[in-house]
């Protein structure tokens, strides 16, 4: 991830106790910063390989609140984001540009540069989409997207909203229902 999006600075979240209790900590951070600066210099502004398509994370917020897909503090358990944390961590180091889209984006037409849509979260939450999945425009747009070669990945309870005898509204696409 650091090679794909180089850092200009490193912060350690206000853990001043690290500096006071372990004097060698500052020296080690200085060494790490030096290594990153060397990587920047060696890269000479070149970009790393990126897949020819984007991966989209689909939730109720989309780009407006992309930070809502995860929580900032990694050591505190958040039930609502548990499913998504591993997905976002994996994507951060992979050769994909990631875009966050919402259901209005899907209704308006899935952007042509998106090759995979990921829907992650618990049922009936803004993370997975809740009642958006009973909107025929949404499910039709994603079925068409997959039919034309796009990928759809679900984690947790994707597309979940009990409706017309189905729990996962795209069970036909995913090959599984609850």
Where does each model-flagged region fall?
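Short, well-ordered secondary-structure micro-motifs within conserved domains or adaptor modules
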Residues: 109-131
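Hydrophobic targeting/anchoring helices
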Residues: 1-80
